[in-house]
Amino acid sequence: MQIKLANPRGFCAGVDRAIEIVNRALEVFGPPIYVRHEVVHNKFVVEDLRIRGAIFVEELDQVPDDVIVIFSAHGVSQAVRTEAAGRGLKVFDATCPLVTKVHIEVAKYSRDGRECILIGHAGHPEVEGTMGQYDASNGGAIYLVEDEKDVAELQVHNPDKLAFVTQTTLSMDDTSRVIDALRTRFPAIGGPRKDDICYATQNRQDAVKQLADECDVVLVVGSPNSSNSNRLRELAERMATPAYLIDGAEDLQKSWFDGVERIGITAGASAPEVLVRGVIQQLQAWGATGADELAGREENITFSMPKELRVRSI
């Protein structure tokens, strides 16, 4: 069996920044540091931060007064920001800047009196945060659609004053079809010049397609609640390549590789490389050879840290 590695894979700039915000807050202010929702959707990362003194909560009413709270990479609604400000909580915002870009778009549509359609998955924290940017007090509304069926059934107040945005971690192929359906049904609809799916999501989806084309089975390292990791598994499966979403080497089953010659490995944007290395080691213990990295797009994007948490140069 030969191992092939997707490129790029694993951490993106937004995830790097979010994790570093929690780490730096722990170093500068000491534990406990409260984090609203898992800072990124990865079990290994969250447990490591919890051991270091991060306390993960789902709502601000679980946060005591006079403590530091961090908003997760997925972003929060304006109502959550207002609640934090009203309580005087010291907040560091780990929202991915590419999610913030979508928030700004939604807020602008709301101010302009345009209704907004969000393409995304119900219940995902990024979707909840993005929908919470729309101020419906001026009579408009924001709608959530997941697929073409939702578009066909959608009823809006004014189809001539309508715009769309998208969750950043969706399947590019699925989203393209939904956008086409929206433009067919609502010819006057506005939106971003390109969909809001982030560069890292696009790059990892392109890479997993290449991997699935060249391999007999694909392993996606990522947690079950990671949207972008699930999309990678689905993309490989759509190319008729068996694919498995795993948290790490402990989830591997030897029977998956019976008769397999080429094993592809990728990782979601919130999965650290140490987990990939653990998977490679286990496969090599079962007789796999090599770990050849495919050619792919170079990523050199970085996002700045909050001023108080920046490492000071000497």
From Swiss-Prot:
This is 4-hydroxy-3-methylbut-2-enyl diphosphate reductase. The keyword Iron-sulfur applies. Its cofactor is [4Fe-4S] cluster. [4Fe-4S] cluster binds at C12, C96, C198. It comes from Pseudomonas fluorescens (strain Pf0-1). PANTHER family: 4-HYDROXY-3-METHYLBUT-2-ENYL DIPHOSPHATE REDUCTASE. Catalyzes the conversion of 1-hydroxy-2-methyl-2-(E)-butenyl 4-diphosphate (HMBPP) into a mixture of isopentenyl diphosphate (IPP) and dimethylallyl diphosphate (DMAPP). Acts in the terminal step of the DOXP/MEP pathway for isoprenoid precursor biosynthesis. The active site is at E126 (proton donor). Binds 1 [4Fe-4S] cluster per subunit. Disulfide bonds: none annotated. Keywords: 4Fe-4S, Iron, Iron-sulfur, Isoprene biosynthesis, Metal-binding, Oxidoreductase. Isopentenyl diphosphate binds at H41, H74, H124, S226, S227, N228, S270. (2E)-4-hydroxy-3-methylbut-2-enyl diphosphate binds at H41, H74, H124, T168, S226, S227, N228, S270. Dimethylallyl diphosphate binds at H41, H74, H124, S226, S227, N228, S270. Its EC number is 1.17.7.4. Belongs to the IspH family. It is an enzyme of class 1 (oxidoreductase). One of its GO terms (molecular function) is metal ion binding.
